[in-house]
Amino acid sequence: MSSIDPPAGHTRPIVFFDISIGDTPAGRIKMELFDDITPKTAENFRQLCTGEHRINSVPQGYKKATFHRVIPQFMVQGGDFVRGDGTGSFSIYGAQFEDENFKVKHTGPGLLSMANSGPNTNGCQFFITTAPAEFLDGKHCVFGRVIDGLLTVRKIENVPTGANNRPKLQVRIAECGEM
């Protein structure tokens, strides 16, 4: 058993993204959330996947959000449904919330981690690693992992990019939710 496997008898939440690149469906990414290691961070992400957190009866979350930053051999970043450009922040706890912990390390591809602009600035933005990124340990909270659909992550990683590592084709979360 690795350090990121769940305790015996514990079932972690599984969420998904259906991805489109341009106007073409690209596949599904299924992610396991570490609610036993990072409960607050995992719950924020889960609710933004399901849209169950609402403001004035309007679901808040990742449906129709984009991946706005792609760096091959590093990560794909998305989730800014506020502004769409990497400057927006929102969480179910308010605009931002604190770093929960740094127990899980950025040891390889397929790890789900919070994007931030410094200590205790977590919101809606996240990234999925496509390679080891140990230099992020202690700065970004890993709260889940891809359990199916790493090929879809690789498709995102290979979209041509322009200025600011922005994909030249729109990479969109067409649908999302909890399994």
Swiss-Prot record:
Name of a matching Pfam family: Pro_isomerase
Nucleus among the record's keywords? yes
Where, per UniProt, does this protein localize?
Answer: Nucleus
Alphabetized UniProt keyword annotations: Isomerase, Nucleus, Rotamase
Provide the Gene Ontology terms for cellular component: cytoplasm; intracellular membrane-bounded organelle; nucleus
What enzyme class is recorded for this protein? isomerase
Q: Which InterPro entries match?
A: Cyclophilin-like_dom_sf, Cyclophilin-type_PPIase, Cyclophilin-type_PPIase_CS, Cyclophilin-type_PPIase_dom
Q: Which residues form the PPIase cyclophilin-type domain?
A: 16-178
- The question of whether Cell cycle is a record keyword is answered with no
So what does this thing catalyse? [protein]-peptidylproline (omega=180) = [protein]-peptidylproline (omega=0)
Show the CDD domains listed in the entry.
Answer: cyclophilin_ABH_like
Query: What is a single molecular function from GO for this protein?
Result: peptidyl-prolyl cis-trans isomerase activity
Q: Name one GO biological process term.
A: protein folding
According to the UniProt entry, what is the EC number of this protein? 5.2.1.8
Q: What domain of life does the UniProt record list for this protein's source?
A: Eukaryota
Quote the PANTHER family the UniProt record gives: PEPTIDYL-PROLYL CIS-TRANS ISOMERASE (PTHR11071), PEPTIDYL-PROLYL CIS-TRANS ISOMERASE D-RELATED (PTHR11071:SF561)
- Similarity section: Belongs to the cyclophilin-type PPIase family. PPIase H subfamily.
- The protein's role, per its UniProt record: PPIases accelerate the folding of proteins. It catalyzes the cis-trans isomerization of proline imidic peptide bonds in oligopeptides.
Q: What is this protein called?
A: Peptidyl-prolyl cis-trans isomerase H
Give the organism's phylogenetic lineage. Eukaryota, Fungi, Dikarya, Basidiomycota, Agaricomycotina
User: What gene name does this entry carry?
Assistant: CYP3
